[in-house]
Amino acid sequence: MNQTWRTHLQSKLQQLHERGQYRNLHVTEQAEETWLIRDEKRMLNLASNNYLGLAGDERLKEAAIACTRKYGTGATASRLVVGNYSLYEEVERSICDWKGTEKALVVNSGYTANIGVISSLVSRHDIVFSDKLNHASIVDGIILSGAEHKRYRHNDLDHLEKLLKTASPEQRKLIVTDTVFSMDGDTAYVRELVELKEKYGAILIVDEAHASGIYGSGGAGLSHIEEDLAQKIDIHMGTFSKALGCYGAYLTGDAIYIEYLHNMMRSFIFTTALPPGTLGAVQKAIEIVKEDNERRERLIENGAYFRNHLREAGFDIGNSSTHIVPIVVGSNETALRFSKRLQQVGIAAIAIRPPTVPVNSSRVRFAVTSQHTIADLQWAIHHIIRIGKEEGFFV
């Protein structure tokens, strides 16, 4: 290996070690279950995005197997070549029915959806307004686009409006936000964002990755909680990899947006399509979440139970109002120590550090699912509070 490169890489890795930001891969089995095996230890799974427990659902497995047997293991090409199986059109029609939109586009992941849609729609003459806590894929899409990037303070609509007023009349304007923020568990003010985008002539993209399948009518997303709100949003992005228990993502909105993305979105054009088995599982998952109100209600109840007990105990859980509950502890070292102690007693909860979250806001992030029992959560809460007291986390 080139010695200059070796020295450079070793130096960068050493810096990560010193800052407490070095990351390791850990072998995990049965992550689709309520209890998993991590580094050969059985733990209560409070770390996954399998919010409705569908990743291990037999109906999804059977659908994936049936489509794999019929169509094979791989799509064999990009969708614009010969990889556009009829399954794609079936899933996209289901998404439109679910979301009440004209047209949809299924893509390979939430990351490729966000970097692709943003970098396709705007360029260096345009301006993007993005919540400061938006997902990294949104930030990367803006960087790729070359557009002017204005970050507004988290959920601060007054700051956003102030920034909107600074835009040149000649600039095309895009507002983009997560609806459920993945590291904080709070939610965006979607109606107010719609009002601002209409007032200032912008378009609005919402990332429903952590809301799809959970909130709104039939689990269509947070933007569907209020009647008629969703139709005023230009583009909805959501994923199949969280509450739906599969893999992939979608973009949906007016037909002209999707037609444009077919022709301009590089992360769609230049990649092999999803495997048929994945599409079969996705189609089944959409059918299930549209009808299964019980899972959604149980998830929301479990989230409230877990969240309220931790808040009452004195932990800093920020403004969490969902199934995602962080305990913010500050330093990288403290978050790592807290996570390690939880894993030692059998709780899988992972330390989240910069650059995933802002400096000095490292945390342990808990993700509750519909499959957790109250007994599971009570057991976890007991140990979290005990360890929290020993570590002095209470304010």
From Swiss-Prot:
GO molecular function: 8-amino-7-oxononanoate synthase activity; pyridoxal phosphate binding
Cofactor section: pyridoxal 5'-phosphate
Binding site for substrate: 23, 135, 356
Gene3D superfamilies linked to this entry: Aspartate Aminotransferase, domain 1, Type I PLP-dependent aspartate aminotransferase-like (Major domain)
InterPro entries: Aminotrans_II_pyridoxalP_BS, Aminotransferase_I/II_large, AON_synthase_class-II, AONS_Archaea/Proteobacteria, PyrdxlP-dep_Trfase, PyrdxlP-dep_Trfase_major, PyrdxlP-dep_Trfase_small
Keyword Nucleus: no
Binding-site list for pyridoxal 5'-phosphate: 110-111, 182, 207-210, 239-242
Modified residues annotated as N6-(pyridoxal phosphate)lysine in this record: 242
Catalytic activity: 6-carboxyhexanoyl-[ACP] + L-alanine + H(+) = (8S)-8-amino-7-oxononanoate + holo-[ACP] + CO2
Domain of life: Bacteria
GO BP field: biotin biosynthetic process
Annotated function: Catalyzes the decarboxylative condensation of pimeloyl-[acyl-carrier protein] and L-alanine to produce 8-amino-7-oxononanoate (AON), [acyl-carrier protein], and carbon dioxide.
Name of the featured protein: Putative 8-amino-7-oxononanoate synthase
Provenance organism: Bacillus cereus (strain ATCC 10987 / NRS 248)
Gene name, Swiss-Prot/TrEMBL: bioF
